[in-house]
Amino acid sequence: MKLIVGLGNPGREYELTRHNIGFMAIDELAKRWNISLNEQKFKGVFGAGFVNGEKVILLKPLTYMNLSGESIRPLMDYYKIDVEDFVVLYDDLDIPVGKLRLRMKGSAGGHNGVKSTISHLGTQEFQRIRMGIDRPKNGMKVVDYVLGRFTSEEIPDVNHSIEKAADACEEWLNKPFLQIMNTFNS
C-alpha cells in the first residue's frame, strides 16, 4: 500500500494558490486514477483505489499547512503504512515554477508543512516531490506570495509540473524512488 500526500490549506480562499500546488497534484492523481476523495477522517480528506495492482491512498490534510503532520501520522498508523511507502508533494520557493526536485530525505528547508510532518513522523527520512513556485519578486512578502494565485503566464508551467509530479507518482508505484529521482531530476 502506498500513501501519496499533497500539502496545502483547506478552503475556497486558498484554492489555486501557490501554497496549494500539492493539493492540485493530488486532484490530478485522483482524476487520472479515478479515485474519489470522499473520506473525511484523520483531519483530512482522502480516497483509496488500486493502480496497476497497488493499493494507493491519496490524502489532502485539512489541518492548514503548518499542522499537516497531525493528519498524516494517524492515517499512516491506522493503515500501518511504512515511511518508505509514503511520498509528500509540496511547494518550494527555491525551485523555478514548472520544475520538480525529488528527494529521498532531508530537512524541512523552511517549509512549515514539512516541518510538521517531520515532527509527527519522528524522521526526516521520507520521500518528497518538491514543486517549484519560485521566489517573490519586487520585495513582496513571502507569506503574501505563497498565499497568492499563480499568474496567467505561470499557469502553463504550473500545469506541466503537476502533470510531471503525477507521472513521477505513477512510476513510483512500480519502481524504486531513487530510480524515479534519476529520471525526473535530470
UniProtKB/Swiss-Prot annotation:
Keywords: Cytoplasm, Hydrolase, RNA-binding, tRNA-binding
Site (Discriminates between blocked and unblocked aminoacyl-tRNA): N9
Gene3D superfamilies on file: Peptidyl-tRNA hydrolase
Entry annotation: catalytic residues: H19
Keyword Protease (UniProt): no
Residues that coordinate or bind tRNA: Y14, Y64, N66, N112
GO cellular component, one term: cytoplasm
GO biological process: one example: rescue of stalled ribosome
SUPFAM superfamilies recorded: Peptidyl-tRNA hydrolase-like (SSF53178)
Main location: cytoplasm
Domain of life (superkingdom): Bacteria
Compartments where found: Cytoplasm
Enzyme Commission designation: 3.1.1.29
One Pfam assignment: Pept_tRNA_hydro
Stabilizes the basic form of H active site to accept a proton (site feature) positions: D91
Top-tier EC class: hydrolase
Catalytic reactions on record: an N-acyl-L-alpha-aminoacyl-tRNA + H2O = an N-acyl-L-amino acid + a tRNA + H(+)
One example GO MF annotation: tRNA binding
The protein's assembly and partners: Monomer.
Function noted in UniProt: Hydrolyzes ribosome-free peptidyl-tRNAs (with 1 or more amino acids incorporated), which drop off the ribosome during protein synthesis, or as a result of ribosome stalling.
NCBIfam families reported for this sequence: pth
HAMAP family on file: Pept_tRNA_hydro_bact (MF_00083)
Family: Belongs to the PTH family.
Protein name, entry field: Peptidyl-tRNA hydrolase
Highest classification ranks of the organism: Bacteria, Bacillati, Bacillota, Bacilli, Bacillales
